[in-house]
């Protein structure tokens, strides 16, 4: 197996190690919540760091020192502002390199190398088959970065014009992590493009001719999942509006419709499906991106678990057939 293709399966670089560590941390947090109550950590800070919004309020009484580090949950919009600007810039650099042959900026190239990217190989040493594979991967990277930017832009729109935020809070550590998260995700996507020095492996003159079934399927899954997530957010928003669309309260109600008929956190399920659609776009065998998906799975599952417990403890009439995150399973 040649060059970067072989390295794809064998190297645990700093980027992969980071995603693996994040996934393991959220898996551990989830397992602790599923364990018997006597085994749960009593540390208020631990509980404060893994909860946000309504689930933070529904837990045990929080010490004043924890409340001092609260920031409004509506600051979620800041995450998407950062993502639109940062990942839009990365998309611009990638487009310039793919279609015009412009090299990446020195700082970006150095950052990718620091993260331990394995996609660097001298072009002259690659076979024709490897060059074709490189073009497919370049197209996958371009499409996934477009998906990430479109996703962030839609979520930013929803934060401003759809969502109705209550006065709940997130911890300042969660806020800082959210700001860094989309920067890291964008770099993870960009790191998958094959490069020779500061130039992208495959120029984009005939890039679209490299489209394969997984590119098309991934695109279809992305828009399908995004449409469901948007619908779920509209459903949640309408719980706090009257028929004219005017916000009348910020209380919590039981959501019905779309994937909410199956799970309590349908929007989190849609988020997972969006990331899986990106894994499909990468051809289903990109180890690095599957580590990202694994992190998303456990982080969303943890939040969904808290949501589900909140709904069940708050509403006596809550549908008993609903699961927390995965239909019919969990």
Curated annotation (Swiss-Prot):
Its EC number is 1.3.1.94, 1.3.1.22. Keywords: Endoplasmic reticulum, Lipid metabolism, Membrane, NADP, Oxidoreductase, Transmembrane, Transmembrane helix. PROSITE patterns: S5A_REDUCTASE. Residues 1-16, 111-136, 191-206, 299-330 are cytoplasmic. Expressed in the 2 tissues tested i.e. testis and liver. The chain crosses the membrane at residues 17-37, 90-110, 137-157, 170-190, 207-227, 278-298. GO terms for molecular function: 3-oxo-5-alpha-steroid 4-dehydrogenase (NADP+) activity; oxidoreductase activity, acting on the CH-CH group of donors, NAD or NADP as acceptor; polyprenal reductase activity; polyprenol reductase activity. Residues 38-89, 158-169, 228-277 are lumenal. Pathway: Protein modification; protein glycosylation. Coiled coil: none annotated. GO terms for biological process: dolichol biosynthetic process; dolichol metabolic process; dolichol-linked oligosaccharide biosynthetic process; polyprenol catabolic process. It is a multi-pass membrane protein. GO terms for cellular component: endoplasmic reticulum; endoplasmic reticulum membrane. This is Polyprenal reductase. It comes from Rattus norvegicus.
